[in-house]
């Protein structure tokens, strides 16, 4: 279909087809938010073309911004012409990633000084713009050249032979080293063990002034103004990239897809490690060894371990720069990026990072944007940029979960044992500073286990605890109780990050996790043999048959220190922004320490502070008050900077029938509170309602219940009373599985049943899917057309108010957020909002496109309360009908589906 060029308010928005009116409104409002540097909360129901509205609206703004910038640059750089002051200021504040340089002058400063400073600022601006111009021209020429001659593939073939020769030389060198040549030998180590020893550590203070930073700043070019788009899953990001390709901007946009090493790594040895943390550490370790080998080392004698380390064959700067250019030439998804990296023998993970500065649109998953350390490691610079966070209905929970972490007693004891054995093994080779930090970490681990009531010298699985239960503490109280308040956790965290101790420890367990005959015979290694036995006792899962004598036993325990690092980092959070939950169970191994983040705004504040504009978008964003109060206001965003936009649905008003039913067929009032929902009469009334609905609704009926446990109880009761048999007459019954791996299988069977019923004349008219609010079926699954002709919500899924985490969060909000006169406490509002967000996300599964139709049935009289109605999505709220009794409700459902399924009979 030919592209449409829509003009809205004097702005041209290219669009692949005539947009809906709500899409026009969406794009116009989005353009205003980006132009004005605002924070926008956008709600556009699924099925209304939200992705295309975001793409065409945002990229239209970027197109116009770049044009204005080029025009202003030309004006400023024209010989003999000076731009007006306002234009100069505009350039200064909007130039890519540059902080405004205009600073207020001191009062009473002489005019000639002020004039001199202003002229210098103008000269600096002109110089910077000239440099940007040169870089832009070089980039355009480079991309044009790559497009014309296909250098990348040619270069890959040319260098392959050279790399094979290099690898052969490396093998020869390793064989020579394994023979034990060289004057420096403190003691004989096992083959390949040298790289496990920590290098000499320098703190930040010692490094200061000698630029030994790991970041390769000299390789980075200036970041142009761009849009960062992030979503929850890789499948959602892939779908977004496909939408960009289909849009009028698909051929001209420089788009980069970012992902984790788990997604983009092409080195099979690294991929086989499995864990993302292990892959990250191994990758960085290989880069370090490459830098060590490339260094001159003339001023220092090279240590043996530096010579035997291997580097990644895909980490080749020349090849990665060529891969970067290929990425920028045309839009590519993750699969294409990986395939191109393999063909070019260049790392897609780093190739995509190299492409960030020149990219116009960067597509990335949530953690890469919302976690500061990950963001920094990826080379993402937010200063002056635009961020769009899609599928953001759970944004607050996502930030909280990313920065909350838990470690159990087994992990703490295992890490202590591993680290102690490591220190004893390499004590003579470790420098004093390394030993100091290792002893501090051992002390921390010992004290954390003691807080749980255990002893690191004993097996955690057999240490029983006399006192059990959960205890919630402030960060400072926890540190005092643990007797570790005198340790600088910031320095320990930095040491772990820079020394890569976790990675060394993992290599150590890999090396000595295999029982070799020599180990049991050697006096030196008896301690390690005991260490192996301890590790075996901590392994989870079924016990395998014992191997025959002399046979190696393969143990691959990943060092839990990697996991504990995140917990230590969390403990550096400000005291008021987090809590530590000490959870004591039957044994030390089952007990745990959990860090709970209370204030997600502390991590979101940097994003909104640095960015030019931020857009938070989703299909169901109601209630929006959480975003305003918990996230934006607490991040220091002024109310005047926040813009809210919510549009209706594209479906005709008569294609949806939302009903609130207050009582059932036997006049039993529907109130599914925690105290009443398990009563036999309530469970039976629910079954009777579903039986009636299934008799008149064609295709699929999706029924959401508050929890898996309640679903199990209801299903068992219906089976016992015969209600399940009555339901099965019209609908085949499916249940949502707890295991995520089984969801796809159940969905396929559910869909297949409905399709087969639509082509048959039997009694079976479709299927009933019993699902759980907050489960896999309530998010990301589309029940379009016959798959979801009726969505039933049983009760109101309030969260467990007895949860210590939730109680602490409520107390925190009551203490920190202002309370409006006559309104409930912020903590009470939180409970209601969590419930309504889950409901809105679930009932939004039914309507997926303009010609779709469905009935939405809310079973609970509490839905009729004005405060609850106000938090439903506007497109549902405006059409909802409250039915006090079941008879009129049933008649309305029957009439609706008869008219929609058989319009010719009406």
UniProtKB/Swiss-Prot annotation:
Biased composition (Basic and acidic residues): 284-301
Cellular location(s): Nucleus; Nucleus, Nucleolus; Cytoplasm, Cytoskeleton, Spindle pole; Midbody
Cofactor needs: [4Fe-4S] cluster
InterPro entries, sorted: ATP-dep_Helicase_C (IPR006555), DinG/Rad3-like (IPR045028), Helic_SF1/SF2_ATP-bd_DinG/Rad3 (IPR014013), Helicase-like_DEXD_c2 (IPR006554), P-loop_NTPase (IPR027417), RAD3-like_helicase_DEAD (IPR010614), Rad3/Chl1-like (IPR013020)
Record field: catalytic activity: Couples ATP hydrolysis with the unwinding of duplex DNA at the replication fork by translocating in the 5'-3' direction. This creates two antiparallel DNA single strands (ssDNA). The leading ssDNA polymer is the template for DNA polymerase III holoenzyme which synthesizes a continuous strand; ATP + H2O = ADP + phosphate + H(+)
Cofactor binding note from Swiss-Prot or TrEMBL: Binds 1 [4Fe-4S] cluster.
Segments carrying motif DEAH box: 390-393
Main location: nucleus
Role description: DNA-dependent ATPase and ATP-dependent DNA helicase that participates in various functions in genomic stability, including DNA replication, DNA repair and heterochromatin organization as well as in ribosomal RNA synthesis. Its double-stranded DNA helicase activity requires either a minimal 5'-single-stranded tail length of approximately 15 nt (flap substrates) or 10 nt length single-stranded gapped DNA substrates of a partial duplex DNA structure for helicase loading and translocation along DNA in a 5' to 3' direction.
Subunit details: Associates with the CTF18-RFC complex. Associates with a cohesin complex composed of RAD21, SMC1 proteins and SMC3. Interacts with CHTF18. Interacts with DSCC1. Interacts with FEN1; this interaction is direct and increases flap endonuclease activity of FEN1. Interacts with PCNA. Interacts with POLR1A and UBTF. Interacts with RAD21, SMC1 proteins and SMC3. Interacts with RFC2. Interacts with TIMELESS; this interaction increases recruitment of both proteins onto chromatin in response to replication stress induction by hydroxyurea.
Name listed for the protein in its UniProt record: ATP-dependent DNA helicase DDX11
Species this chain originates from: Mus musculus (Mouse)
Organism ancestry: Eukaryota, Metazoa, Chordata, Craniata, Vertebrata
